[in-house]
C-alpha cells in the first residue's frame, strides 16, 4: 500500500516493507510480482514525477535482497512504460479511463485509448505482458483542463 491520506504522492510504510520482506522470504522458492500504486522511478514528466513514491530507496533495499522478483507493476501515471533495474522489470500500466501524455512537463492528457496490462508469470520465471487498448471508444477528452 503506497497511499498516504490526503496526499497525491506515495510512501511505503515501514510495516508494509516488513510485510513485503516477510512474504518474499516465505515464498523465496517462487517467482513473484510486486504491485504498488505509485511509480517508484521518474517517468520524465515533471508534473507527475513530483507525485511518485517518495521512499523508493526503501522499497529497492527490500527488493534487492531477493532474486525471485520478476516484476514490479504500478499505476498512477495513466500510461504504459517499462524500466529495468537489477534484473527486475518495472512496468506502469495504462488507465482504464483517460491517459496522461508521456514526457510532458505540465499536466496534459493523451488521446490514447483506455487500456490495461495483463501479466503472465510462468513457473520457470518467464514473464509475458501485453497491453490491451479499448477499441472504438467514443471518449471525449477535454484537453483544456489543468489537472485531474
Question: For each predicted feature, which ranges?
Answer:
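Short, solvent-exposed loop/turn segments at secondary-structure junctions
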Residues: 2-5, 39-41, 78-79, 96-98, ...
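His/acidic metal-ligating clusters that form di-metal
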Residues: 7-91, 127, 143-148
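Acidic/histidine-rich helix-loop elements
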Residues: 5-12, 104-109
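Binuclear metal-dependent phosphoesterase catalytic core
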Residues: 62, 84-148
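Short acidic, glycine/proline-rich loop/turn micro-motifs
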Residues: 3, 43-47, 101-104
Amino acid at each position: 500500500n503506497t497511499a498516504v491520506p490526503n496526499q497525491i504522492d506515495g510512501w511505503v510504510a515501514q510495516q508494509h516493507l516488513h510485510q513485503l520482506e516477510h512474504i518474499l522470504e516465505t515464498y523465496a522458492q517462487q517467482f513473484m510480482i510486486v504491485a504498488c500504486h505509485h511509480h517508484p522511478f521518474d517517468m520524465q514528466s515533471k508534473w507527475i514525477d513530483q507525485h511518485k513514491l517518495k521512499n523508493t530507496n526503501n522499497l529497492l533495499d527490500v527488493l534487492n535482497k531477493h532474486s525471485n522478483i520478476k516484476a514490479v507493476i504500478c499505476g498512477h501515471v495513466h500510461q504504459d512504460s517499462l524500466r529495468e533495474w537489477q534484473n527486475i522489470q518495472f512496468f506502469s500500466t495504462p488507465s482504464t479511463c483517460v491517459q496522461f501524455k508521456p514526457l510532458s512537463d505540465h499536466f496534459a492528457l493523451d488521446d490514447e485509448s483506455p487500456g490495461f496490462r495483463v501479466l503472465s508469470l510462468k513457473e520457470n520465471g518467464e514473464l509475458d505482458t501485453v497491453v490491451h487498448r479499448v477499441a472504438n471508444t467514443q471518449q471525449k477528452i477535454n484537453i483544456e483542463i489543468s489537472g485531474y
